[in-house]
Amino acid sequence: MDEAIRRFIEHLAVAGRSPHTLAAYRADIELLENMMQAKSARDATAAELRKALAKLHAQGLSSRSLARRLSSWRQFYHWLQRNGEREDNPAAGLYAPKRDKLLPKALPVDGTAALLDRIEGESELDARDRAIFELVYSCGLRLSETVALNLDDVDFSDSLLRIRGKGGKERLVPIGAEAMLRLRTWLGERSAGMDEPALFLGRHGHRLGGRQVEKRLRDWAIKTGAGQHVHPHMLRHSFASHMLQSSGDLRAVQELLGHANLSSTQIYTALDFQHLAKVYDGAHPRARKRGKPDDENKS
């Protein structure tokens, strides 16, 4: 191993990096050393690094892997520069090829309706499942947000849901009529764990876990013919896709989803909630009306 590489790895070890991290740095920098052939990696130029990246890319290395290797090289040269062993960092101005953006998978409107409408059965768990998946699609919930919901997060009088999203940020989202109906049915049959604050419970009366929700949806998707690769986040993607198709209001959908940024270059844009509710009511396929029954049960 080159002396400079060895000292860099020792520096990382003293800094408390894990053995796994040390091995990754060593492999990434030794890879570059081997690609440089007669020249030491410590003396590489920006052009040579760019050529090395291009060669790895041509060999089929993923964008994620290229980015990791470039990051290792950049840290190595930064350390050399800080120690006075190089005047520049040849990796500082280089960027790995952008990662291929995988489009989120969403069900079509009729496919979503077919799945939700075919979740049948008379048991308490069936009622719970109908409520969960209607609510996920109605409000564009993340799985983590779904299982974190408590009973008092549902405002039955105004058909609103309080959601605790990423970073502890809360948002209010309208609940569609179909989801409200399913929620009331579920709460009417929710017999176990009455002292449990969680909105959705498992068989033993405790808060339902994310993996249980994933398995239940996968089982229902197979049973109803929707396919075996349906997962809760697909319902969130479907919510976003269908709302955009119907309303074209990207900023409103951003608010409803709880995204901090409209895009990588745009800051968070807050909208008036009344506008959000108007967009929601007019656009969501299963929220044509949000009724307020006189005999509301807020328990």
Curated annotation (Swiss-Prot):
GO terms for cellular component: cytoplasm. One of its GO terms (biological process) is chromosome segregation. Gene3D superfamilies: 1.10.150.130, Intergrase catalytic core (1.10.443.10). It is found in: Cytoplasm. Keywords: Cell cycle, Cell division, Chromosome partition, Cytoplasm, DNA integration, DNA recombination, DNA-binding. GO terms for molecular function: DNA binding; tyrosine-based site-specific recombinase activity. Disulfide bonds: none annotated. Signal peptide: none annotated. SUPFAM superfamilies: DNA breaking-rejoining enzymes. Forms a cyclic heterotetrameric complex composed of two molecules of XerC and two molecules of XerD. Belongs to the 'phage' integrase family. XerC subfamily. NCBIfam families: recomb_XerA_Arch, recomb_XerC. This is Tyrosine recombinase XerC. The lineage of its organism: Bacteria, Pseudomonadati, Pseudomonadota, Betaproteobacteria, Neisseriales. The gene is xerC.
